[in-house]
Amino acid sequence: MDSYQEEEPVASTSGLQDLQTLSELVGPENAGEGDLVIAEEPEENPRRPRRYTKRDVKCVSYHAYKELEDKHPHHIKLQDWIPKPEEMVAQKVQNQDVGTILSFDVTCLKSITSLGRNDPGNDPSIMSHVLPVVTPWPMSQDHYAPTLFGLLDRYYKGYLENPATFQTWKFTCQEDPSGKRYMGTQFWVPPLGQVNIQFYKNYQIVTCCQALDPFANIFHGTEEEMYDIDSGPDVWCTPSLCFKVIYEGAIGQKQEQKSWLCRLGYGHRMGANDYRRVDLYAMKQGKKNPYGDKGDAALQYAYQVKRGCKAGCLASPVLNFKALQFHRTLMADLTNPKIGQGYLAHGYHAAMEAYGPQRGSSEERVWWNATRNQGKKDEYYREGGEEPHYPNTPAPHKKTWEERHKVLKLSPFATPSDIQRWTTRALPYGWKVIDGNGDDYTSRRNIRTLTEMTQEEIRKRWERGYCDPFIDSGSDSDGPLSKPQTVKVW
């Protein structure tokens, strides 16, 4: 198992001595201990093209949510929901070091990934702005503010639907197992799960347990059976879904922050293991079911996505890569949420297809080792061995995953957007799919003739696996002149 002892020692960062300056913009002239300093822009060289400087790439993720606040002056404000610096001073909030924070979950800590574009290493996932973990909307790995604003945005939408059971985040002063004081709160955000936020003077910590869901993942057995992993709910705490992200810096820091992604396993703190069956039923009391009928994106994520990504037998770099593929597919649709936005995507079918097999596959493992994405020493499967019920070895005489999933089959939880996309991709032009409600979806597939195709399109046909770019699929039904047919999906 990956543990924090295997990581390079991290220097302790004591925060600002005077928290009164936390709300000010930190610059080279007034930066305190523990703050990141923005480098000054170098002078322009007229003989060379201008390159991006540190000032250009900094503050990108922080302003992702600031732009939203400026566009909606009467909307919610993040600073109205998080503790004020003066309040943290009054409560005597203390500094903490990252090694001590990691030690709290050492028994359930599956891996630690140091994130940041300036972080040394050969893991490409650390270079992204998106936090490499499967979530309903993308979170930021560069700054805590967009991540919290996305959570607040989604939480506030639930408040508008059912104001009697929602309230402002209540931050209270608490002590961690080492005795250090911090400001913390926790709340449940569907379909994500249970969220816990901690503010130290020099760190912000967000812990998320996606296995905690009293509406979509509750177990109806006995109290003893509930804590048995062999007979528990469908989704238990797994390193592919449960995580803790640690942001380094003061609460008022505007610059890009250093962060660590910790993947948590079964039995982690602030997770589903801390809740008894009676607690889950109590969480449902007085709350409106946040999930709609089949076709609702929230229901699709709570049931299909979590059950399709729960296996934790793969190594952390592989899970990071698959999670980024998941978010990349979602963000390719510009109408889906971006960093700093907390609404749901139109559908997660395409993202699940991009995520691939949750337990891995032979061809994916061969590709991973052949491309050497993580170097020769890094493995495809988790170093700590197999997780329960998630074997590393594929069944013998079984077709490869690619052969069985040329087009990922439709799920009963697919949204209308997913059905339309699947119909256009899987069925000939003019064919229809009719769902249980009587709504029909017509395939828009169109095959262009050779005279209309460019050299770039011909090359792409080669890359997609066509043996000859000048030959169609061999079916007369792949064009506008085909005879439409209807397929019923119930």
Curated annotation (Swiss-Prot):
InterPro entries, alphabetized: Foamy_BEL
Keyword terms, alphabetized = Host cytoplasm, Host nucleus, Host-virus interaction, Secreted
Q: Does the keyword Oxidoreductase apply?
A: no
Segments of skewed composition (Polar residues): 11-20
Region Disordered, residue ranges: 1-20, 25-52, 471-490
Q: GO cellular-component terms in the record?
A: extracellular region; host cell cytoplasm; host cell nucleus
Please give the Pfam families that the UniProt record associates with this protein: Foamy_BEL (PF03274)
Keyword Secreted attached: yes
**Role:** Bet counteracts the innate antiretroviral activity of APOBEC3 family defense factors by inhibiting their incorporation into virions. May be implicated in the establishment and/or maintenance of viral persistance. Bet is required for viral replication.
Assembly, per entry: Bet interacts with host APOBEC3C; this interaction does not induce APOBEC3C degradation, but prevents dimerization and incorporation into virion of the latter.
Instruction: Kindly provide the name given to this protein in its UniProt entry.
Output: Protein Bet
Q: Which organism is it from?
A: Simian foamy virus (isolate chimpanzee) (SFVcpz)
Recite the lineage of the species: Viruses, Riboviria, Pararnavirae, Artverviricota, Revtraviricetes
